[in-house]
UniProtKB/Swiss-Prot annotation:
Keyword Zinc: yes
Cofactor note: Binds 1 zinc ion per subunit.
GO MF annotations in UniProt: metal ion binding; metallopeptidase activity; toxin activity
GO biological process, one term: proteolysis
Keyword set, alphabetical order: Calcium, Fibrinogenolytic toxin, Glycoprotein, Hemostasis impairing toxin, Hydrolase, Metal-binding, Metalloprotease, Protease, Secreted, Toxin, Zinc
All copies of domain Peptidase M12B, residue ranges: 14-16
UniProt protein name: Zinc metalloproteinase atrahagin
Family, per entry: Belongs to the venom metalloproteinase (M12B) family. P-III subfamily. P-IIIa sub-subfamily.
Annotated tissue distribution: Expressed by the venom gland.
Classification of source organism: Eukaryota, Metazoa, Chordata, Craniata, Vertebrata
Length: 16
């Protein structure tokens, strides 16, 4: 279970 914040953080991390 991931929260929108965690998901957003993961997206940014992968994008970099």
């Amino acid at each position: 279970t991931n929260t929108p914040e965690d998901d957003r953080y993961l997206q940014d991390y992968v994008y970099i």
